């Protein structure tokens, strides 16, 4: 930015200079700083036009003098300010500025020049679906704001109104954008079934984890992503585990996809055979990119001592089975699910000073998976070992102390169960319910 310090005496050497008009100016938008003190107006503008390469024709403006101090100004803006303050007429034609005395006694600026005070209009927009405060934040933040420097937007939460004050063109652009953004958001219903199931029963449901020969619809992750036998796992999952092995009783992420059309019936049948224990069947309803969660469990109290004032307080830690889902709908109606599954349970008692505290055994899965509308994602990897002891004996004879072993048989059954979460997302249109959607899908099949 250039600086010009012009005094009245400086122009004594410029009075004999003729008026210079350049046919091909370089630019008239270069910004500069200027300070004038009782300077002759015509000679000052003539010298500035010469230094700025601006085409300027000055009419009979008498012997006006001017004092001013302006920062970060360009030549067109300077001419507008002078025309307004000295009641002159400013026009621009074919790249040439014309500055003349005003016959009406008021400063006039031609329509093809920006005025000092822009014309602002006010407009209110009633929102039907979007929240006024959130939409206003989207319109005013960031480098892509549609507001002009003189514009403003306010909102009224009670009536869910946006009040826009800006130049007419900016108001029209903002109204078009609001119309695109104020639309009903698609809802996503998340069906989850949290069960413990044997490995044999899981295979009966059609789940194949693909431990050594992963297929298109089955993936298994144990530890880091780099040590697995398939190459495109990073395109399907976003997982970070600290361990690199999966011993018995540990947690390893397993993801698969199955046809969930008859899943409820099959799980109920397996439950009657005591091969499945259905822990919970939560249903979550949320909107695009909004989190939904459900927890089931208990809170364990802990005594916390404050050494400063020698007081004690009670704090609680959660030991729950929890599911948190954040869906993202793509343009082709595929759904990216951010899943956080936690299985936290009270652990062993640990001596702490003169008291005992209960530890919390934590197992968590945090991953991203893609699913189609209505497709069932299966998450597993939390294992539980159960040992069942039983005794078969002949009545009466099996109770005689000396000979009872001849007429009885003891057996021990070792069973490995896995905590499995079935997650099925459904995209609901406006006014649609999950029950109506499922009936519609079953009718098509």
UniProtKB/Swiss-Prot annotation:
PANTHER family: DNA UTILIZATION PROTEIN HOFQ (PTHR30604:SF1), PROTEIN TRANSPORT PROTEIN HOFQ (PTHR30604). Its main location: membrane. Residues 1-23 form the signal peptide. Keywords: Cell outer membrane, Competence, Membrane, Signal, Transport. Belongs to the bacterial secretin family. PilQ subfamily. One of its GO terms (biological process) is protein secretion. The lineage of its organism: Bacteria, Pseudomonadati, Pseudomonadota, Gammaproteobacteria, Pasteurellales. It is found in: Cell outer membrane. This is Competence protein E. Involved in transformation (genetic competence for DNA uptake). It holds the Pfam family Secretin_N. GO terms for cellular component: cell outer membrane.
